[in-house]
Amino acid sequence: MTKLSTTKICVKSPAKINLHLEIIGKREDGYHELAMIMQNIDLFDYIEFENNQIGDIELKSNNKDLSLKDDNLIIKAANYVKDISKKKDLGANIFLKKNIPIGAGLAGGSSNAAATIIGLNKLWDLDLDNETMLSLSSKLGSDVPFFINGGCQFCFGRGEILENYNSKFDYGVILLKNPNISISTADTYKKYSKEYCSNFLTESEKTNDIRNDLRINGFNDLNSSNQIIKVKNDLQIIVEKENDSVKKALYLLSNLQNCLSFSMSGSGPTCFALFKDINKANEVFEQNHKMFNNNGFEAWVCKLINSGITFL
């Protein structure tokens, strides 16, 4: 039996928003070529990992709507880590306290998968390096590699080509989501391809030009004239056109006092507005939370963070 130095650990698994999501082409492997800026926010799931002596992976959660079977990314990630360890007697009892809404465009499942790789690496004393964890994460989904290091990053390719963005953003964020709505990411990308494929680039040189432009200009901060900062999400035009709830959320956010910018995150349906700092976001939230609820939205207030998955 493998002797381990740690018996139980807990990690914070953060959500993300997209400050920039640009679809620039279609890859030979069927995925889309993307240019993105992804940013962690301080809305967290909490995952507890405890060693067991029977070599099984068991998952429980406070969320009754969540599948706890082999299709759950936490289970998949745990099995990948166990396989690479080559130690059949390793096992874990995992408890997920779910706070990030499911199917919301906030990548909660992807974050949980990365947190499982990082958490079990420590729990099982595997000493996997960052490159190995990134390689494992890329097998689980396009957004998962981002969460291995987290913070704010440029994400290229299908999301697996990562470059750190040395941002110092401290914006406050208000999130809105209709709890009765979820959106298929795959279907949204298919619809975008069908409607806008004529805009896709085919030359790698032009793809590199877009990447370099994003690296140089990035997510533009407020300038001296206090103009509204720029966010971009190519999928928004598809989802907003087909989903009245998303359209309403964007309208409500756009009319909030002191809103610097607003957008949809990922493939939706969660939408967000940015504010000068967390204090301003809290102030606006307190003034409007009843209005959000009356319009059928769940709402959260949070802030951008420069860290990713962390241990408690």
Curated annotation (Swiss-Prot):
Residues annotated as catalytic: K16, D143
Keywords for the protein's UniProt record, in alphabetical order: ATP-binding, Isoprene biosynthesis, Kinase, Nucleotide-binding, Transferase
Broadest EC class assigned to this enzyme: transferase
Gene3D superfamilies with a match to the protein in the record: 3.30.230.10, GHMP kinase, C-terminal domain (3.30.70.890)
Listed EC numbers: 2.7.1.148
Residues that hold ATP according to the record: P101, I102, G103, A104, G105, L106, A107, G108, G109, S110, S111
Domain of life assignment: Bacteria
UniProt GO BP: isopentenyl diphosphate biosynthetic process, methylerythritol 4-phosphate pathway; terpenoid biosynthetic process
Biochemical pathway: Isoprenoid biosynthesis; isopentenyl diphosphate biosynthesis via DXP pathway; isopentenyl diphosphate from 1-deoxy-D-xylulose 5-phosphate: step 3/6
Catalytic activity: 4-CDP-2-C-methyl-D-erythritol + ATP = 4-CDP-2-C-methyl-D-erythritol 2-phosphate + ADP + H(+)
Molecular functions (GO terms): 4-(cytidine 5'-diphospho)-2-C-methyl-D-erythritol kinase activity; ATP binding
PANTHER family linked to this entry: 4-DIPHOSPHOCYTIDYL-2-C-METHYL-D-ERYTHRITOL KINASE, CHLOROPLASTIC
Family: Belongs to the GHMP kinase family. IspE subfamily.
Biological role: Catalyzes the phosphorylation of the position 2 hydroxy group of 4-diphosphocytidyl-2C-methyl-D-erythritol.
Protein name: 4-diphosphocytidyl-2-C-methyl-D-erythritol kinase
The encoding gene: ispE
